[in-house]
Curated annotation (Swiss-Prot):
It is found in: Cytoplasm, Cytoskeleton; Cytoplasm, Cell cortex; Cytoplasmic vesicle, Secretory vesicle, Cortical granule. ATP binds at G174, E175, S176, G177, A178, G179, K180, T181. Residues 81-776 form the Myosin motor domain. The lineage of its organism: Eukaryota, Metazoa, Chordata, Craniata, Vertebrata. Residues 27-77 form the Myosin N-terminal SH3-like domain. The modification Phosphoserine is found at S628, S1114, S1715, S1944. This is Myosin-9. Residues 654-676 are annotated as: Actin-binding. The rodlike tail sequence is highly repetitive, showing cycles of a 28-residue repeat pattern composed of 4 heptapeptides, characteristic for alpha-helical coiled coils. The gene is Myh9. One of its GO terms (molecular function) is calmodulin binding.
Amino acid sequence: MAQQAADKYLYVDKNFINNPLAQADCGAKKLVWVPSTKNGFEPASLKEEVGEEAIVELVENGKKVKVNKDDIQKMNPPKFSKVEDMAELTCLNEASVLHNLKERYYSGLIYTYSGLFCVVINPYKNLPIYSEEIVDMYKGKKRHEMPPHIYAITDTAYRSMMQDREDQSILCTGESGAGKTENTKKVIQYLAHVASSHKSKKDQGELERQLLQANPILEAFGNAKTVKNDNSSRFGKFIRINFDVNGYIVGANIETYLLEKSRAIRQAKEERTFHIFYYLLSGAGEHLKTDLLLEPYNKYRFLSNGHVTIPGQQDKDMFQETMEAMRIMGIPEDEQMGLLRVISGVLQLGNIVFKKERNTDQASMPDNTAAQKVSHLLGINVTDFTRGILTPRIKVGRDYVQKAQTKEQADFAIEALAKATYERMFRWLVLRINKALDKTKRQGASFIGILDIAGFEIFDLNSFEQLCINYTNEKLQQLFNHTMFILEQEEYQREGIEWNFIDFGLDLQPCIDLIEKPAGPPGILALLDEECWFPKATDKSFVEKVVQEQGTHPKFQKPKQLKDKADFCIIHYAGKVDYKADEWLMKNMDPLNDNIATLLHQSSDKFVSELWKDVDRIIGLDQVAGMSETALPGAFKTRKGMFRTVGQLYKEQLAKLMATLRNTNPNFVCCIIPNHEKKAGKLDPHLVLDQLRCNGVLEGIRICRQGFPNRVVFQEFRQRYEILTPNSIPKGFMDGKQACVLMIKALELDSNLYRIGQSKVFFRSGVLAHLEEERDLKITDVIIGFQACCRGYLARKAFAKRQQQLTAMKVLQRNCAAYLRLRNWQWWRLFTKVKPLLNSIRHEDELLAKEAELTKVREKHLAAENRLTEMETMQSQLMAEKLQLQEQLQAKTELCAEAEELRARLTAKKQELEEICHDLEARVEEEEERCQYLQAEKKKMQQNIQELEEQLEEEESARQKLQLEKVTTEAKLKKLEEDQIIMEDQNCKLAKEKKLLEDRVAEFTTDLMEEEEKSKSLAKLKNKHEAMITDLEERLRREEKQRQELEKTRRKLEGDSTDLSDQIAELQAQIAELKMQLAKKEEELQAALARVEEEAAQKNMALKKIRELETQISELQEDLESERACRNKAEKQKRDLGEELEALKTELEDTLDSTAAQQELRSKREQEVSILKKTLEDEAKTHEAQIQEMRQKHSQAVEELAEQLEQTKRVKATLEKAKQTLENERGELANEVKALLQGKGDSEHKRKKVEAQLQELQVKFSEGERVRTELADKVSKLQVELDSVTGLLNQSDSKSSKLTKDFSALESQLQDTQELLQEENRQKLSLSTKLKQMEDEKNSFREQLEEEEEEAKRNLEKQIATLHAQVTDMKKKMEDGVGCLETAEEAKRRLQKDLEGLSQRLEEKVAAYDKLEKTKTRLQQELDDLLVDLDHQRQSVSNLEKKQKKFDQLLAEEKTISAKYAEERDRAEAEAREKETKALSLARALEEAMEQKAELERLNKQFRTEMEDLMSSKDDVGKSVHELEKSNRALEQQVEEMKTQLEELEDELQATEDAKLRLEVNLQAMKAQFERDLQGRDEQSEEKKKQLVRQVREMEAELEDERKQRSIAMAARKKLEMDLKDLEAHIDTANKNREEAIKQLRKLQAQMKDCMRDVDDTRASREEILAQAKENEKKLKSMEAEMIQLQEELAAAERAKRQAQQERDELADEIANSSGKGALALEEKRRLEALIALLEEELEEEQGNTELINDRLKKANLQIDQINTDLNLERSHAQKNENARQQLERQNKELKAKLQEMESAVKSKYKASIAALEAKIAQLEEQLDNETKERQAASKQVRRAEKKLKDVLLQVEDERRNAEQFKDQADKASTRLKQLKRQLEEAEEEAQRANASRRKLQRELEDATETADAMNREVSSLKNKLRRGDMPFVVTRRIVRKGTGDCSDEEVDGKADGADAKATE
């Protein structure tokens, strides 16, 4: 069933394809493809052809449509439906390719061959075509034998690697989400199965399993969900799988490229970060969550979109799979935990929040819980970490300074740290996997590389990462195009094949140059690197430079409008991509906070410190900020000591990758995305078409069909296919090319199917596969024949054996029959009885003879035994001698071998030296010849020089004469140049018109001359006036039109400036409107106030009193508002204190034990808190009471005033008139005030918005102003140019006005051309037969056009000269002809209409020509297709003829064999019946066995589940015990932490007082130390230099002979250069840190003053803390007593342990001694062993207790640190509360005093006057209050703005000063650096020389020792030979041994040598 399901997705249904009805229907309907907006192309039947158009009937709905013939594409017959290789299509066009892919995709067939490569369409669902059965199906099969599959591509790559011994690569290309990663996994799966040294999956090797598990690990850490793809690779990888000679996998290596690390900190909408974060948070258990401090998804800031799930994937299960994969990969658990800790730490980094302090820009960390978690996870100190982030040490000059960071800088540092940590972890993981995959010792012979890189990405806005990804894909596509199209055709030309080079127009090099070109002009990456070196460079300046350098590049575009968010556009092969250059400089430099980096390098966690081991190579933030301003523009290249940017590193990586790929044989897999909705079974035709066009699929198929994709070397072709032509090549024939020609003739191949090159035979696609099939058939025939011969031989042998057996049986039968006849005959019986008796008599005689012989033999035997004993003794002696001789021989052979080796070396050296000598002699001869030649040349040159000198003298005199002429001609030349410039401009403007009229200009000129003569002779003055008027009118009108057009062009040129100016104008308009509104409102308010004041001044004293009351009331209201604000502040502080107190409560409740002392402390703190709360509540109550009293008093005063008003109303009737007038005025004022208030409210609302916008837009406004000024300059320049252009245009108008008269002649000519076009259209129908004639006509037309163009150019130049003269004449005549403008206008209109008609006709002609070109190209393609089909048909005919011949031969053979097969069939049927019965019985037995196996597996599963349950229950019990122990340890740790905390609290105040002195001393010490270090380094370098100079002088003579060691020395030099770079980087950092330290010192001095003030404040709080400290001391003493007891107990336990160990040893000795004493001893032994075990248990308990105590001590220290920080916070809060309380008390006192004064003043002064005017006060009171409040707010805002302005100005001045200081320091540092570099380079050269000489001496010494050893061996061998010559070897050895006794072998040899020497004397 599984196989059937797989076949559905692999094989095509043949019934549908071979349907005859469909074939007939296609032929009858004339089906074609027509364009469709919905489906790309849709089928239609061709009904009728009408000229250029055709009428078609759509198959889908029967609708008839008119379509242009060029848009119609042919349809393939139904038999080509769902074809596996699209190169087989008869009609190759876009519609056919798309239709074939669509049909296969909808049938589940996702793989399709496209010529030499494979096209894959993502199915977006799982298909059953990747099982092991499918792998076995494709294993070892040829490509044409199986349907298309990724396994087939992989198998062909594997087989070609094994056959050709050439490295292979499989490149998966395509957009993001097209399925590259999945296909890569399938490639690795296939190779791991096919190339495994283990046969079955159960026996699968560890390396293969690790190789398969590498992908899941990398996907978890490097893949993420994007909008386009749920498992998008956010990095590129090149997997290199190494194979040995036998084709087995011996190792692998993975290289990664450009991890998108920014995804770790932020993600786009509906996207995820890397999978591992979600896996960990979902799959981690409770224990792991507590260890890693994990939190829910929504608590992490770096997870931008929270918990985004992937459909069909469980993150929890994926976590388990990832951990299992890491286990298989061999990553230990501690490293796994290190990885998970780093991941949790990265997430926690995002939770660190910084806030800006109130008075400064400095950042602060109000809550450090996240920082504590990060520090715990990464193994670093919290305080150092926070200090490194908030106030890092930065080098300023030579000193280090602590610099306070702003909020933005701190946030950037945290994000950069998170990205760098994750990237380093990923890099470590890749190295770890490579280490695991490359551990085999077998050598790799070749490799297959699989490339899976991030696909092409086009988002709404694309950043630096997308540029790098798209740049990579551009390079890969270029490699594909170069391999498929360029290299293929170049090889054809190189091999001398007849081939016309086809340009497919797919060169992507311009786009690649735009990105990567280093200079002339520099590309985008080069410009980015260049900008990174400029300190004031910004992203905007980078964009401006890119636009300036690459603005005219064809692949580069500027954004059309400024409102577009993009900065620039690049036209890639996959489409136009908009890029936004935000933070590109930072991304390219990738800076880091080096303080935190060094802290991480010093981490207590080994894993973290290993990640940051290369901390010296990072780019610090100070390095980026303090880069030299004097960096040259070309300084972006890598130099000594300079950091390398991300772009540079990536470009180098990519260059290496491309070099690797070029050295391999590439196999391309083109992955295509069917839709953007990720839906299965849906295919967007337009999307697929775009991808096919971009990837060059059609061109690849076309070159595969037209070209010769298969090629074989001559020798290999002969070796492989000679079996097909056995007798075609004569024996001993050596010429490979001629042999191949003879073979091809014998094969009867069509000449169109092959080409023979210089070294290879080339075949069209399919031919080689056909030859392979024939070869396989031939080999099977040969093997069958061989098997038949073998079987015949064996049968004949068996027959002969049977014949021998038959003859033997016949003999036996004959003898048996004779015996049966004789046995009853009497004489036979008598013979049988008498014969033994005769033998007995003879036997006695024989016995006597034998006894005599036996005695003789015994004697001989004894003699032989004696001889044998003698011989054995002799043999033993000889064997000993033989062994000695063998040893001697072996030594001699070894010496000979060594001597031979030495001789070979010497001869090799001699040959090398001779070769060198010969080379040198040849060089010397060449040099001598050159010298002679140069001397001869020198003589000639001297003669020439003399001649030239004479000529120079003559010319000098002529030159002086010419100098005078030059001065005069220069003025003329300038004028001519100016005229020439004007003429060139005119030519540029008239170029377009000239192209249209070039072919008829000559005729126009002649007509013009005739017309001018006629006009002069006939028209006279009238015609002259009319001509002048027409010219003037035309000139005026055209001038106006051209000015309009120039205005349009100017607007286009200023497109960017208009957009900017529009935006700026809008903003300025808004600001101006708001300012105007504000000014109007303020003016209206001032006018209203002035009116009120004037009216009030005119009134009597009562109004003055009213104003005084109003001022007092406003003061009271201000006081009330200030009190309310104070109250709100106090309430906020109260809330803060309450929250802090509650937090402290919770912390104290968590940390403190339930002891009595702790409860007392807690109760005291609670009492203090309650007291504080009561005091606050009392203060609040008193405050509220005071406010209530004030309100009551105020209301009473108002009521009294109201009563007085009523009394005064009755009494003072005289004031009623004045009151009425005032009331009318008041009403008017009220209306005005209401209107003002409404307007003011609106303006206030707008003002707030504008203030918010102003801050954002001020920077933009300033930039806009700058741009506007630049554009204004450009506009002014353009205006000047326009003025000059208008003058030129006026002149050209006068010329064109005359030309328009003769345009009527063009009409007849255009009619002629139209008739020609109609004739061409008629001829177009018969183009297929007359194509060659058309090409000839076209060539002739082109030649005519070129000739006409040349003539037109000449005539135009003449005409321009005449026109210039005419223009000058006409200018003079223009002044007289102003009167006749109307007639000229009419004539002009007519001519304009004629011109438009002519231009339209010309455009129609051009369009018709374009259509003809299109039809020609289409017909050319159709002709190519027809030719290819013809080739196929010829090939098929020849194949059919061959098959027919073979079939006839086979038919004759089959007839003869059929009779034999009939007999064998009868026998086989009988045997088959017997075997069937046996098979049935075996099947039954097998079924029974399978049932038993199933039962056993079921029982096994049950037992496993029971075991797992038991283990889980056991684990739960262990976990609970572990948790209890952990809690106990935590409590003890808290106790220890409290102790240390109290000790630190006492020393805190003293530390703050001494801080200033310590800082000053440290700074002085640092300066002195730094200077000492520099002096020491200089002295050391000088000493080393002197020593090296001495060594160099001694070894100069030897260095000349060591030229061969130069390569080794160069390697050492490179290492030293790297060290030098590191040293220079250190020096740079040291200088920068020194400069920053100076700045930090100044800041610290300012801070110290503030600290001194803070110290005074803290002294007040110190007394309170001391009281708490005393209580804590009591607790500490009790805890110390407990500690002492614990320590005593520990010491006692250790003593007991030692005693127990001693007792154990003694008892063990006693047991050993008393083992033989019996039962009592055994009992004693058991008792003692039990006692030992008890003691050991007690010892282990004591050790555990000590460990617990140590843990508690550590935890107590940590807790004390936390309590210190909490206490500091409490102090600050208490101080703030105390200050707030004092302020409130002061305010209360002041308010009381003011109230009393007001009450007394109101009662005494204003009782009489208030009564009359109280009503008016009540009405105007609210209005005035509101206005005063608004004024106060406005004044406050003004003050704030002024403060901000002052701060900004101060900052600007500080920055300017700092910049000047930096410049000076940088100059000094650069000079110092240059000196150091020179010294280091000299030292390096000397060191290299010394090392080379040292190595040479070592080698010579080794050679000398070797020669000495060889000589010693030769001497010893000669001595041995001499010994053998004087006396026998055995005797001498015996003598020596007797003499030496027990001496060593060396002494024996020495003595023997001495004896030999004496003997010789």
